[in-house]
């Protein structure tokens, strides 16, 4: 099955908003064993939308179209669809009823602009939108099935999950020549994408049913595995075999699979160890704490954090001795170690993490230029450990990789530590 996605709207092609619908659709279809072959962004230009619809329908079995279904003058995607199909727009009584119900629930009546959303191409199938006013519209164009969805991500996702994906799945199941697929997304940190590619290359001949793919989601790199076979059992077996080999190759650089998030994995590793954590952050400005507290239940193991940006607060809040700051500066191995030890003592936790550095664009010294970061871990029974890293890129990138490296020091320590009885 060939699937294409057409996203409409001037706001997409001018950079005013970022298209997130396509990445969501690609990921969800990948779970079904379907690869999106093409994604097209087109502005609010009628001839361009009409031509794009015709071209996509000539190539694909399924075309998912987002945007341009609302009540305003620049919402004319369905008008373009009707023209592409050579049929008129018709006012649908059921959609009219849905609109009146939705507006009445808010004590309103739909105005003439809102009623435009009831006009759909002749012969199409409107489907009620559980999250908004504009319906999903399903129609045929040539040999392709077209799904028209609102561009609002919340509405797009609801209709995709509730209607579009089940229909695509049913079509796949009904095909006698169906290729069965199985998937795994291996999430890594601390290994460059180029090294992943080199490590995976020899596996291809040994696993002919596997399609390897790569995705960078800084600071992570992901390895995508897709098995294709004549039956589901064969696809599952092929995936299991290659996954074993990949896990052996990646070792502890592999932190999770599929939808497992890094911060959640770190917190779960802490929880299994019966340990607690506190952090002292300077250049990252609370980014580590933000990542951890975004995970529900993090308070079970994450006790607290301090953003100690100035030298004064490094001493006042986490007990960095003033003479350490005077001799070694705020960005140094000695200061990072004192921060980690100080926040651990102050919070009474098993572990203390710290990070201090030059995120840029200003600052830095000849010995420690912009991008230099010191990350430290204070742990029971062992000397405090500090690692110096050098990150290239802008301020946000330095902060992102500094936070990642600091947490990874803790994760690797926990993996190497003896299991709690």
UniProtKB/Swiss-Prot annotation:
Organism phylogeny: Bacteria, Pseudomonadati, Myxococcota, Myxococcia, Myxococcales
Family: Belongs to the CinA family.
Protein name: CinA-like protein
Organism whose genome encodes this protein: Myxococcus xanthus (strain DK1622)
NCBIfam families hit by this protein: cinA_nterm, PncC_domain
SMART domains: MoCF_biosynth
Pfam families reported for this sequence: CinA, CinA_KH, MoCF_biosynth
InterPro entries to which the protein is assigned, alphabetical: CinA (IPR050101), CinA-like_C (IPR036653), CinA_C (IPR008136), CinA_KH (IPR041424), Competence-induced_CinA (IPR008135), MoaB/Mog-like_dom_sf (IPR036425), MoaB/Mog_dom (IPR001453)
HAMAP family to which the protein is assigned, alphabetical: CinA_B (MF_00226_B)
